[in-house]
C-alpha cells in the first residue's frame, strides 16, 4: 500500500490541519467543517495524479486543443456523518464522480463499557465493478470502521482501484486493507 503523508511537505494544507487539531480553534464548528472540506479538495487534487488519463481533442474558440482528462470512473465513498465535509471537498474536485455511503456506529459490547465494536447499518452505492473507489474518512483511529466499510462496499462490486484519504490516520490499515483491490 502506498502511503502519502501530505504533512511531510510544506503547503497550506498544514494550516488547515493545525486549525482542526488546535483546541482553541476546533470549537468553531463552521471553520472545522470548512477546513475538512478544504483538506478534501487538496487531497483530491493530489490523488487525481494517480488516475489513468488519455488525451482528448477539445474544440476551443481558437481551434482544437489536446487535453489529458481522466478515464477512471470515480466513486467517492464515506462513512456517514463525520465524513461528509471531506466527501464534499472531494466532490468539489471530482464533479463527475458517483457517491457511495455507509452508515456505521460504535457500540459497547459489554456492560462495563470497555469493549467497543462497530456496526454497519446500511449501504448506498452504485455498482463498484471496474470503478476507482476513493474512500474518504477524516479520522482513522483503529481502522476498524474503514475495514468494515471496505467489506460492505465490495459487496456491491469489486473496484478496479482503491484509494483511501484520511486527514488523521494510523498504520492499522496496512494490516487490514489490500495493497491492490484484486
Which stretches of residues belong to each language-model region?
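PRPP-associated nucleotide enzymes
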Residues: 1-175, 182
Amino acid at each position: 500500500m502506498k502511503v502519502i503523508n501530505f504533512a511531510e511537505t510544506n503547503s497550506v494544507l498544514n494550516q488547515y490541519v493545525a486549525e482542526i487539531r488546535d483546541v482553541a480553534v476546533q470549537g468553531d464548528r463552521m471553520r472545522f467543517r470548512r477546513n475538512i472540506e478544504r483538506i478534501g479538495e487538496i487531497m483530491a487534487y493530489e490523488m487525481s495524479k494517480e488516475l489513468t488519463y488519455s488525451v482528448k481533442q477539445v474544440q476551443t474558440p481558437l481551434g482544437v486543443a489536446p487535453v489529458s482528462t481522466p478515464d477512471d470512473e470515480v466513486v467517492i465513498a464515506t462513512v456517514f456523518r463525520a465524513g461528509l465535509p471531506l466527501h464534499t471537498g472531494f466532490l468539489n474536485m471530482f464533479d463527475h464522480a458517483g457517491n457511495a455511503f455507509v452508515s456505521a456506529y460504535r457500540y459497547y459490547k459489554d456492560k462495563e463499557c470497555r469493549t467497543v465494536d462497530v456496526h454497519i447499518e446500511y449501504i448506498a452505492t452504485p455498482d463498484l465493478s471496474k470503478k476507482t473507489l476513493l474512500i474518504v474518512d477524516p479520522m482513522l483511529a483503529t481502522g476498524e470502521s474503514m475495514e468494515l466499510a471496505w467489506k460492505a462496499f465490495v459487496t456491491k462490486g469489486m473496484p478496479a482501484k482503491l484509494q483511501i484519504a484520511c486527514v488523521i490516520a494510523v498504520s492499522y490499515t496496512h494490516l487490514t486493507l489490500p495493497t491492490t483491490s484484486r
